[in-house]
């Protein structure tokens, strides 16, 4: 990721309109800001959320609240709790997420 031509700024995530995205189960609420080619999101997964697709996009993901389980295409499963993060490159390792109890995440991609 290369960040160019971005002046100092702040974001009040409570003021960013949320969009709702249905999963195979449950839903995800995204609050999204774009800064050039960089997408920054505050995500909220409902309890019982399960992604409806495998994702090949690279991310930096930080779990703020709740618990997130990420399954990789090779069968590995990673569980994040608050304060834990993961990072993955574009087109590197397909992954999909679920959350039994719900989760709040901060994602940069």
How would you name each of these model-derived features?
Residues 36-56, 80, 89-92:
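Conserved short histidine dyad/triad with adjacent acidic residue
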Residues 71, 88-89:
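A generic structural signal for residues embedded in beta-strands
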Residues 81, 90-109:
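Ligand-binding loop in jelly-roll beta-barrel domains
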